[in-house]
Amino acid sequence: DFASKLIQLKLEKYKELVATPLQLDLRENLRVKSKESAFLDLNRSFFLYRLVVLGIDFAKIKRSSQDNATWAENWILQWTPEAEIQIVESVLKGDTIADAVAFVLSERIIEATKISEIADVIEDAFNCGLPKIVEGAKRSLDETANGAIAMCDIADTVSKLSNMISFGDIRKLDREPLIPIVKRLCIRASLMLVGESACDDIAAATLADDIQKIHSVFMMQDFLDESFWFDKLIELSNRDDLNTKISGLATAILLDAGKIDELTLRMEVSRRLSMGMPAELGANWFAGLSMRNHYALIGRLTLWESLSEYLDTLDEEEFRRSVVFLRRAFVEYSAKEKDMIAENLGEIWGLNAQAVSEIINSEIKEVDTDILEDFDFGDF
């Protein structure tokens, strides 16, 4: 079956010991007459993905240099003695490559314990052009989704399914059955959001990524009702008894979406960065706020004025507590973005922007490291 497919898909010349690149255009070729020729590259993609699922090292996919070109795929093909052995071993799983892949994916569905693992099977079946496996995995996902699910599992699953719904039309498979699952999981994520946010800072790091994945799905898919999700984000933003980094992130998302105006932001910053708020909590909230849309935050001078005023109110011990979280907040900022922050702070403090920039962009000095090592972090 492998040999006949190489001939049918015009891939015989790639059965060489030297690695050879292959670029595929999955769109229909309208310049040819036969259906087989029109979808040659799409069928090549199905075939190569099937080899990947079977663990046959004849083909390896590379990320396209055009991020938005969902129709473009880049592969590296290379024949090896190991690939020949792997093909022989795959015969035990089915008489044809398609049968063997169906067997492997069906086994993975049976062994799956998380919905994200089933979503991986759906994604692989989707890429392999196996609609019957997609349907079987969808039914299994429906059943598993009725049980207890972690937020990270929901985030991974809806992110994968959403990408298939948005960009999968190029593979000529029916994606409609996936829509109800995404709807149900996104509603469940909305219901879980506030409760999950009562967590420590270690769990908050993972939860922050999950929230951003789920929010991206809400923004990408028109069939989702985002109003309930935003209601929960507003509640999360206003609550004081939840992880402050997650509350800050919720505020940042609402700010991006135009759900918070400048006056409301200024009031929230003043509330969070005040003498009544423990230093580490205020700095952690600001770290959450800084996780999204850096340029939008940098452009708000009032935000940096509030931060400056807040730091002025801290004593030495409180400042040391807050600086740990603030340094983490700026880790994800580029040198250019830090320069722009320096200009803001220089203007507020009446200092030279370049001098401030050098301090912000500098590495931690040994004496600073010693101070941090001597500091008692036990309280938090």
Give the predicted meaning of each segment.
Residues 1-380:
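Extended repeat-based interaction scaffolds and adjacent low-complexity, acidic/S/T/P-biased segments
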